[in-house]
């Protein structure tokens, strides 16, 4: 009888735990995806902060010339970064237990893999958590669908691109100047500005900003007055009110006359779907462009495509871009310290201590 009661208590404890995990009454919803999201994001954040502040230099190029990225090794907030794993590691999985010592793991940039893989796992679980909460509240799943765009972009630069290039050392450094370094080198090696998917992505991001500004300004300009002239118009809105807070007919009429009639939405639902769709599709296409260039399916190359009747090249803008690409690629050449974002530190370590004896 006692054993039966213990089994019931155990089941009851598990049921209470499940109920707490999936409860929508908690201040912050946890969910089953949150069970994995919370530890992975906490791990990624903790290791990132520690590495950004105190990690020793990393042999990113695999040429025994470590590059310093942490604050304690001479960087500031702008130049600091978590340096990607060494080219000597390639795309091998490199957890702490695969290294001979902690010093070796740090020297080869192990923290970068740890941060990136935990971060990508965490944000993927965040997508699932958004879907899970929407499902339990009876909402549609579009919030989680929209968040797949930035997650796809992060996965492209942190995971897909290193896999395509054959080494995590080609991944984007976790820092401000490291991000710019990555962008310049990416342009030099892949001509991303001439990739149609990236161009569509730029249209998506800038277009989304424009549409957001247009929508916000139109709504703010056509608010239904519920307050006196001496009060802020914002006080005229009560959270949860059923009435419209702005006059969509006035906004539609204004914008239709400003541009032309069919440039303006007359359906609030389709308008907001469009506002969500435009930047999301743009960022999807940008992530797809990086993922294709990871395997060297690069941007268009129109270099020296215009010649005169004598066969002489007439330089076009494409040739100017090509010259800039060559300059950036040369400046980033391995073991040539003329690129200001590469902060080299420490003496080069000899690979062979003695020269081999050659007989004959």
Curated annotation (Swiss-Prot):
GO-annotated cellular components: chloroplast thylakoid membrane; photosystem II
Entry's Gene Ontology molecular function annotations: chlorophyll binding; electron transporter, transferring electrons within the cyclic electron transport pathway of photosynthesis activity; iron ion binding; oxidoreductase activity, acting on diphenols and related substances as donors, oxygen as acceptor
Keywords, alphabetical: Calcium, Chlorophyll, Chloroplast, Chromophore, Electron transport, Herbicide resistance, Iron, Magnesium, Manganese, Membrane, Metal-binding, Oxidoreductase, Photosynthesis, Photosystem II, Plastid, Thylakoid, Transmembrane, Transmembrane helix, Transport
Residues bound to [CaMn4O5] cluster: 170, 189, 332-333, 342, 344
Membrane-spanning parts: 29-46, 118-133, 142-156, 197-218, 274-288
Free-text remark on how the cofactor is bound: The D1/D2 heterodimer binds P680, chlorophylls that are the primary electron donor of PSII, and subsequent electron acceptors. It shares a non-heme iron and each subunit binds pheophytin, quinone, additional chlorophylls, carotenoids and lipids. D1 provides most of the ligands for the Mn4-Ca-O5 cluster of the oxygen-evolving complex (OEC). There is also a Cl(-1) ion associated with D1 and D2, which is required for oxygen evolution. The PSII complex binds additional chlorophylls, carotenoids and specific lipids.
Removed propeptide positions: 345-360
Binding site for chlorophyll a PD1: 198
Subcellular location: Plastid, Chloroplast thylakoid membrane
Domain of life of the source: Eukaryota
Catalytic activity: 2 a plastoquinone + 4 hnu + 2 H2O = 2 a plastoquinol + O2
SUPFAM superfamilies recorded: Bacterial photosystem II reaction centre, L and M subunits (SSF81483)
Positions marked as site (Tyrosine radical intermediate): 161
Binding site for Fe cation: 215, 272
InterPro entries linked: D1/D2, Photo_II_D1/D2_sf, Photo_RC_L/M, Photo_RC_L/M_CS, PSII_D1
One example of a Gene Ontology biological process annotation: response to herbicide
NCBIfam families, A to Z: psbA
Known partners and oligomeric status: PSII is composed of 1 copy each of membrane proteins PsbA, PsbB, PsbC, PsbD, PsbE, PsbF, PsbH, PsbI, PsbJ, PsbK, PsbL, PsbM, PsbT, PsbX, PsbY, PsbZ, Psb30/Ycf12, at least 3 peripheral proteins of the oxygen-evolving complex and a large number of cofactors. It forms dimeric complexes.
Function summary: Photosystem II (PSII) is a light-driven water:plastoquinone oxidoreductase that uses light energy to abstract electrons from H(2)O, generating O(2) and a proton gradient subsequently used for ATP formation. It consists of a core antenna complex that captures photons, and an electron transfer chain that converts photonic excitation into a charge separation. The D1/D2 (PsbA/PsbD) reaction center heterodimer binds P680, the primary electron donor of PSII as well as several subsequent electron acceptors.
Designated name of the protein: Photosystem II protein D1
Lineage: Eukaryota, Rhodophyta, Bangiophyceae, Bangiales, Bangiaceae
Gene encoding the protein: psbA
């Amino acid at each position: 009888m006692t054993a039966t009661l213990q089994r019931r208590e155990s089941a009851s404890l598990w049921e209470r735990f499940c109920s707490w995990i999936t409860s929508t009454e908690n201040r912050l919803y946890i969910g089953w995806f949150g069970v994995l999201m919370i530890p992975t994001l906490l791990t990624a954040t903790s290791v990132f902060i520690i590495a950004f502040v105190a990690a020793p230099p990393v042999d990113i190029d695999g040429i025994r010339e470590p590059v310093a990225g942490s604050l304690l090794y001479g960087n500031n907030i702008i130049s600091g970064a978590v340096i990607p794993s060494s080219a000597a590691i390639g795309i091998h999985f490199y957890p702490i237990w695969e290294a001979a010592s902690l010093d070796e793991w740090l020297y080869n940039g192990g923290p970068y893999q740890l941060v990136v893989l935990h971060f990508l796992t965490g944000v993927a679980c965040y997508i699932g958590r958004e879907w899970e909460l929407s499902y339990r509240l009876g909402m549609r799943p579009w919030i989680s669908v929209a968040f797949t765009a930035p997650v796809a972009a992060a996965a492209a630069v942190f995971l897909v691109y290193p896999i395509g290039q054959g080494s995590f050392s080609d991944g984007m450094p976790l820092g401000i100047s490291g991000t710019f370094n990555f962008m310049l080198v990416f342009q030099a090696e892949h001509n991303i500005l001439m990739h149609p998917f990236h161009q569509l992505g730029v249209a998506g991001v800038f277009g989304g900003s424009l549409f957001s500004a247009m929508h916000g300004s139109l709504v703010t300009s056509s608010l239904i007055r519920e307050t006196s002239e001496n009060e802020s118009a914002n006080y005229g809105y009560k959270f949860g009110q059923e009435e419209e807070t702005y006059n969509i007919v006035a906004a539609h009429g204004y914008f239709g006359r400003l541009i032309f009639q069919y440039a303006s939405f007359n359906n609030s639902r389709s308008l907001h779907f469009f506002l969500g769709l435009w930047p999301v599709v743009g960022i999807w296409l940008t992530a797809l462009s990086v993922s294709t260039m990871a395997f060297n399916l690069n941007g268009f190359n129109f270099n020296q495509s215009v010649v005169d009747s004598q066969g002489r090249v007439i330089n076009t803008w494409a040739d100017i871009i090509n010259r800039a690409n060559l300059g950036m690629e040369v400046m980033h050449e391995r073991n040539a310290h003329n690129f200001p974002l590469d902060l080299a530190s420490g003496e080069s370590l000899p690979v062979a201590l003695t020269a081999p004896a050659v007989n004959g």
